[in-house]
Amino acid sequence: MDQKKLCIASLGSSFAAGPDIPPQIKPLAAMRSGQNYPHLLAQRLNAELNDLSVSGATLLNITVEPQSAPFSDHIFLPQISDLPSNADIITVTAGGNDINYIGGMISDACGAPMQLPDPLTIDQLAQRLGGVLDELHKRAPGARIYLVEYLAILGPDTRPDQDIPLGRERITHHSGIASLLQRAYLAAVERRGDWCERVPIHELSLGHALGSKEPWVGGFDGGPLLHPNLAGMKAVADILYERICINSKALL
């Protein structure tokens, strides 16, 4: 008898979807790569993948709010609508758009202020993240949920005004936003450890931020702008694969 394949579902925003990493797959309005970390992970595990990630998504777009795609008339239903109830593994990377993380950094670096909504506080973000996790757990109670942090954009090798058009003070500011996102992830997994865990991608990728010898994100000199590149997606998939294998051995 053939062994049943693992069922993986991936939800989230652009750091899961992989805009500007070829090949871009349909629906193109999702700006989703066939080589994002969910696809690479599914290949490693020989698993069935339901990739529901959409670039630009907020946490509310995962659970309750439809999402309008820019430059398109495509409307995405809340991602949870297509979450299979028999999922074994769920990955989530989201929350940055709720605090204007990347959009605010790009706007600042370009010197072109964007009309952005007021960001959430850390408590509000952690509460919203926790609510998303709870809804996913209700929909797929047998799944292990991995809350996958964002790859680091700014790190110890990032040189002000060279690797990114931001001065030291603004780099410190945006590093603080990244830290806020990390703290919200930590808070969200508290009391949910029986079925959910945080994957500390930010810390593990600080040595591969802008200005490093092997950056896992694109900068202003090429690649996906302040987003994961292919090397970054491969790194996240590798880290997740190792974590899942460790968890599987612990269950034997």
Language model features by range: what are they?
Residues L40-L49, R128-Y146, L180-P200:
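A structural motif corresponding to the C-terminal end of an alpha-helix
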Residues Q24-Q127:
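Conserved SGNH/GDSL esterase-like catalytic core that processes O-acyl groups on lipids
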Residues T93, V148-E149:
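Alpha/beta-hydrolase-fold catalytic nucleophile elbow
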Residues K5-A29, I99:
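Catalytic nucleophile-elbow at a beta strand-turn-alpha helix junction centered on a G-D-S/GDSL motif
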Residues A16-D20, L59-I62, I99-G104, L154-D163, ...:
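Short acidic/His/Gly/Ser-rich catalytic and metal-binding motifs that mark active-site loops
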Residues C7, D88-T91, R144:
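Structural motif
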Residues L151-L252:
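Catalytic His-Asp segment of secreted/periplasmic serine-dependent ester chemistry enzymes
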Residues L77-P84, D123-G130, D134, K234, ...:
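Amphipathic, non-transmembrane alpha-helical secondary structure
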